[in-house]
Swiss-Prot record:
Multifunctional RNA-binding protein that recognizes the K-turn motif in ribosomal RNA, the RNA component of RNase P, box H/ACA, box C/D and box C'/D' sRNAs. One of its GO terms (biological process) is tRNA 5'-leader removal. This is Large ribosomal subunit protein eL8. One of its GO terms (molecular function) is structural constituent of ribosome. It comes from the Archaea. It is found in: Cytoplasm.
Length: 126
């Protein structure tokens, strides 16, 4: 199955697992915004430290604007394979198409590592 058009780069599974772990830690010790509307607002206000986007969102238009907006605001973003697992990492009973980490809390070191890896994947030097 091919990736949706909004997925701009491939994220290895082990990195996606670290992203979900960071979301869980940030939920418990920092601050996160759940859902695409809240995530979009956090990015527009340049408050997000990291944006997480699920790869299996239908229709794609729900999150298609996020990578471009993140690039424009210079906010790092990363993908995870499943909106269901992203929702669970946020402590929700439902799926989450996207999440913004506002304050990573105890996940700060993990978030820094994720951002560094994402920049390497995207071919940028950090």
């Amino acid at each position: 199955m091919s990736k949706p058009s909004y997925v701009k780069f491939e994220v290895p599974q082990e990195l996606a697992d670290k992203v979900l772990e960071a979301v869980k830690k940030a939920k418990d010790s920092g601050k996160i915004k759940k859902g695409t509307n809240e995530t979009t607002k956090a990015v527009e206000r340049s408050q997000a430290k990291l944006v997480v986007i699920a790869e299996d969102v239908q229709p794609e238009e729900i999150v298609a604007h996020l990578p471009l907006l993140c690039e424009e605001k210079k906010i790092p973003y990363v993908y995870v394979p499943s909106k269901k697992s992203l929702g669970e990492a946020c402590g929700l009973q439902v799926a989450a198409a996207s999440v913004a980490l506002m304050d990573p809390g105890e996940a700060k070191d993990l978030v820094d590592e994720i951002v560094k890896r994402v920049n390497e994947i995207k071919g940028k030097s950090s």
